[in-house]
Amino acid sequence: MDLASLNAFIAVAETGSFSEAGERLHLTQPAVSKRIAALEQQLQVRLFDRLGREVRLTEAGRALLPRAYRILSVLEDTRRALNNLNGDVSGRLTLATSHHIGLHRLPPCCAPSPAPIRRWRWTSASSIRKWPTRRSCTAAPSWR
C-alpha cells in the first residue's frame, strides 16, 4: 500500500469522481483509476461501486477511509515532529474569515509571522460547511 494510492483513494472518496480526483491530484483520470485498481488488487477488495459516472464507496471503502486519513495524518505528524527537532516550525495554518477580512485585513497582520509559513490557505468562512469532516480550521479570527 503506497501513499500515492491512498491519496488517490481519498480524493475519489471525497469528490465522488475519478476525473475530479485527477484534477485535484494533477493526474489524468486513467492514472487515478490505475492507482485505485492497484490498491484494490493489493487489498483484495473492491473499494468503489462504479455506476456509470457515479462512484460510491463499498463497505470495504467505508472501512478504509478513516484509516487512510489516520495513516496520512500520522505520517504528516511524524514529518513535522522530526523537522521540529531541527528547530524548524512547520505545519498548516488554515484561517477561516469573512471575504473582506481575508482579503484586506489579515494579509498585513500575518506578514510578520514569527515562523516562516510556507503554505497559506485562504478560505471563506461560508465554505467551511462544505469541507469533509477530517479537515479543521486552525483559527477563525473575529474583528471588533
Curated annotation (Swiss-Prot):
Gene3D superfamilies: Winged helix-like DNA-binding domain superfamily/Winged helix DNA-binding domain. Keywords: DNA-binding, Transcription, Transcription regulation. One of its GO terms (molecular function) is DNA-binding transcription factor activity. Residues 18-38 bind DNA. Residues 1-58 form the HTH lysR-type domain. This is Uncharacterized HTH-type transcriptional regulator in ibpB-leuC intergenic region. It comes from the Bacteria. Belongs to the LysR transcriptional regulatory family. It comes from Azotobacter vinelandii.
